[in-house]
Amino acid sequence: MQIQQPPPEVARVGLRGIKMLATADGEFHTLERGLMDAAQKHILGTQFELDDLESITPRELADGIPQPLREQISNGCLITALIDGEASSAERLLLDEYAEAFGIKSPELTNLHRLVDNHLLLFRLDVARRSFLGQRVKKFVAERGLRGISHLIQGLRKAENQEVADRYRGLGDCAEGTLGRSYLDFTRKNGFSVPGEIGGPPEPVVFHDCLHVLAGYETSPLEETQIASFQAGLMKKQPMFGMFFMLAQFQLGIQVTPIAGAEFMQVDPDLMLKALVRGTQVNRDLTSDWDPWDDFEKPVIELRRAYNILPR
């Protein structure tokens, strides 16, 4: 995901538009305030008093935001609409007006419509398909064909695949401090199974646990919101669906993945944006074209340096 720091005068215009969206349902929620403060802290580098921001029309907003920044402001509005745990009809209407003024048509906005209209099956399917999870599964099946599909089905049926399980258990032979050894230690410490074991995740999800290790996030719901935001930050293809995935799973209570149950109102806006920006600084999209097996024998500290994974 590319995030730009606009000039202060442009940032103020954008914040006015976001505040209009936040208050469209008649309430300026604490989480919406927190999100706007976090955006100023981690992205904009400004300190505007939110209560002093004037109202603005969609046309005025579009006139004040140059083309390269319109998608970024639109994404900020989408996150704002969801951060309080629900999307309202009033927010949807204003988002439609913003999109028309910006000249933007996006699948993200289509999915916000699905949320408001309670078309949750379509929402789940599309977010899962476009998020890092869907991209990973698609790549896994494309590379392994019918055998890959068979492995996925076997895992969902809670059946053991000893060949796959033994391969991952063998990572215990890697040197201490390597990604392979650290990944296996991470799974065992948290009571997880490895792929191939009963209850283990499908192989396309292994990268996620490896990113937990590389980025230093734990597994509580609050920590999961941060690793998911971090992942969205380093995604090059449809990164906003990484944020949609996280917000649905941990803020809206809508289960998108069959691997873990949904949580409600777990997001801290400041920590979320801090993790998102941290992800944008990584120099490779580790959610799509990275195979952890290429790096399992390398030291974690070396990989953090190679991929520019900065300290928390």
Language model feature labels by segment:
Residues M1, Q47, V300-R312:
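Domain-length accessory/inserted modules outside core catalytic folds
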Residues M1-D166, E263-P269:
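Small-residue-enriched hydrophobic alpha-helices in membranes
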Residues R33-G34, Q40, D52, C77, ...:
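Generic alpha-helix signal with a bias toward terminal, lower-confidence helices
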Residues K41-G64, R188-P204, H208, R312:
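Generic structural signal for short, solvent-exposed loop/turn connectors between secondary structure elements
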Residues I43, T80, R144, G279-N283, ...:
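Short, flexible helical or helix-coil boundary motifs
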Residues R147-I301:
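Core of folded catalytic or high-affinity ligand/protein-binding domains
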